[in-house]
């Protein structure tokens, strides 16, 4: 079986599927996914899921779906080094995630209330990681 080089932009589902197949060519000392420590996205958290209007369920949560403590604890100046080393470091405050979410919001027709809820969802996502992502997961 051929191995695929680890790509930090994979969705959590894609990562876990390839991981189960043993198809990922990981860098040395690559951290294992730990559901007790790693970020849970909306699919694992009813409170977050309830805040996402149906019209924006297509938001690429993969960007925000999986983070590891190695990256979470990494100072901003060090993050590019971790990225080059191909470690997992998904931060929900990542500009890419926010940009994707806002682009998606611009594309859909939401009522004023739904738009307000969607922006509240993005803000909650952002601060969840700032305060500590794993404690927002429903165990």
Regions found by a protein language model. Give the residues of each.
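Extended terminal accessory/targeting regions
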Residues: 1-139
């Amino acid at each position: 079986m051929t191995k695929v080089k680890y790509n930090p932009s994979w969705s959590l589902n894609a990562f876990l599927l390839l991981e189960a197949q043993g198809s990922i060519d990981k860098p040395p000392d690559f951290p294992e996914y730990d559901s007790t420590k790693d970020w849970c996205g909306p699919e694992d958290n009813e409170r977050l899921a309830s805040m996402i209007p149906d019209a924006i369920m297509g938001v690429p949560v993969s960007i925000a779906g999986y983070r590891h403590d190695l990256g979470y604890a990494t100072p901003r100046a060090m993050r590019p080094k971790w990225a080059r080393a191909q470690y997992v470091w998904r931060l929900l405050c990542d500009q890419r995630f926010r940009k994707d979410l806002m682009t998606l919001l611009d594309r859909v027709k939401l009522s004023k209330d739904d738009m307000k809820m969607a922006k509240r969802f993005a803000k909650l996502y952002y601060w969840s990681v700032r305060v500590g992502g794993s404690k927002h997961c429903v165990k």
